[in-house]
Swiss-Prot record:
One GO term describing the cellular component: PR-DUB complex
Low complexity bias: start-end ranges: 422-447
Family: Belongs to the peptidase C12 family. BAP1 subfamily.
Main location: nucleus
Subcellular location(s) per record: Nucleus
Gene it is expressed from: caly
Keyword Transmembrane carried by entry: no
Protein name, entry field: Ubiquitin carboxyl-terminal hydrolase calypso
Length: 471
């Protein structure tokens, strides 16, 4: 379905843009100017993205949501701390029979009540190649705003699309300039060339036989929802026990889903979790540890000073009072406080290293993004042109072609050798009929003269050696 044109699409575009007046032929670009597109082709110009947690983390930051990150999940049984939701990506070679079974399995849990659908953020994917952004928004816009700062763009989108149909919500996403430009700024140059070659009507997330597709799993009002932009309705997998976390319910659903899929078709998948920025929790823990360190250190100094005054004969000295109720001087000796202070120093060093590792990861996310989005075509063409101008390009090409020719020649020789070995082995099993004509003539002449057939040189030498030993 094309998002361009139509009353609902124009209305959604105006609402999502926050009533910003834009020219029909205006060019939209990111802050760096790396991505530009005509306004008329906004919904048709979305590019395909890779499934990478670093890319998704930077994309969330570009959306204006700074306190969130995306992590890849390698083990379903490993506990994950405070996830907002999960994004399930699978590469799927579609088959009608397997597709029908999955549809029949999920059709029973469709939520078709319009009031229930409008109370959550569920958007149908009506814009090609926008499935990555759809999956992220399906998680973020269904979270409690008290626990998550969405930023201006996402907050405005959530407010203005409240009460819209899933189709119009999908159109609003596709026609939001900030989202489109942020999305395309992380695409590889090959994705743009592929879009220009195939046209905007083809989506790797929707229309091809072999497709990458994103599905979101989010807890909403005590129920586990599966939000798939290619399905007509959201899916409710039900609640979980009071003694369980919602992730336990998710694990069971995923185990069942993977069992169905792998039993019917070839499926390759990965799983990502949308979680709070780990640096926030580490920074908060470091602040608490340093506060405790200061308290323990101050108490220890006062205790040592009091002990020194007591040893000097000052009977009026009293044991120091601690500034908080964290430590009671009567309950700890100087040795206990020194041991506690050492443990705090170790914990601080460990968490400082964790914070450094997280910052290094963010830096590598940016480095990988620069390498991913950079267009190397000009460099490669210039490099090859310089080699050709210097007259060494042909020689380099021939050098790289010669090994392949040698390998192919060796392969042919090996095949011929195997065939000859097979023929000789087969001939040796036929007994006397395998003797050569020359050998048959020698044996006939020896029999005619009344002599035994001549021995081979090896046997002749062996007989001479035996005679020498007897002598």
């Amino acid at each position: 379905m094309n998002a361009a044109g139509g009353g609902s699409g124009a209305q959604a575009a105006g609402v999502a843009a926050g009533n910003i007046s834009l020219s029909h032929n205006a060019l939209l670009s990111t802050a760096s100017g790396a991505t530009t597109m005509p306004m008329a082709q906004l919904a048709d110009g979305w590019l395909e993205l890779e499934s990478d947690p670093g890319l998704f983390t930077l994309l969330l930051k570009d959306f204006g949501c700074h306190d969130v990150q995306v992590e890849e999940v390698y083990d379903l049984q490993k506990p994950i701390e405070s996830p907002y939701g999960f994004i399930f990506l699978f590469r799927w070679i579609e088959e009608r029979r397997a597709r029908r079974k999955i549809v029949e399995t999920t059709a029973e849990i469709f939520v078709k009540d319009e009031e229930a659908i409008s109370s959550i953020f569920f958007a149908q994917q009506v814009v090609p190649n926008s499935c990555a952004t759809h999956a992220l928004l399906s998680v973020l816009l269904n979270c409690n705003e008290n626990n998550l700062q969405l930023g201006d763009t996402l907050s405005r989108l959530k407010t203005h699309t409240k009460g819209m149909s899933p189709e119009n919500k999908g159109l609003a996403i596709g026609n939001t300039p900030e989202l489109a430009c942020a999305h395309n700024s992380h695409a590889m140059p090959q994705a743009r060339r592929r879009l220009e070659r195939t046209g905007a009507g083809v989506s790797s997330c929707r229309f091809t036989g072999e497709a990458f597709h994103f599905v979101s799993f989010v807890p909403i009002n005590g129920q586990l929802f599966e939000l798939d932009g290619l399905k007509p309705y959201p899916m409710n997998h039900g609640g979980w026990e009071d003694s369980e976390d919602w992730t336990d319910k998710f694990r069971r659903v995923m185990a069942e889903r993977l069992g169905i899929a792998t039993g019917e078709q070839d499926i390759r998948f990965n799983l990502m979790a949308v979680v709070p920025d780990r640096r926030i929790a580490i920074t908060h823990k470091l602040k608490m540890l340093r506060t405790n360190q200061a308290i323990v250190s101050g108490t220890l100094q006062k205790l040592l000073k009091a002990d020194e005054q007591g040893e000097s004969g000052n009977g009026d000295s009293q044991r120091p009072d601690t500034p908080t109720t964290l430590l009671e001087p009567s309950a700890f000796t100087a040795r206990d406080l020194q041991s506690l202070l050492k443990n705090l120093d170790t914990e601080i060093a460990i968490n400082e290293q964790h914070l450094t590792d997280e910052n290094d990861r963010r830096h590598m996310f940016k480095v990988d993004a620069s390498r991913r989005t950079h267009n190397y075509d000009k460099f490669i063409c210039t490099f090859l042109s310089m080699l050709a101008h210097q007259g060494v390009l042909g020689e380099l090409v021939s050098q790289h072609l010669l090994p392949s020719k040698k390998v192919s020649g060796q392969g042919a020789a090996n095949r011929i050798s195997k065939q000859s070995n097979t023929a000789s082995a087969g001939g040796s099993t036929t007994g006397a009929s395998a003797s050569t004509p020359k050998t048959q003539q020698q044996q006939a002449a020896a029999a005619k003269n009344g002599k035994s057939p001549s021995k081979t040189p090896g046997r002749r030498r062996k007989g001479r050696n035996k005679c020498r030993k007897r002598k």
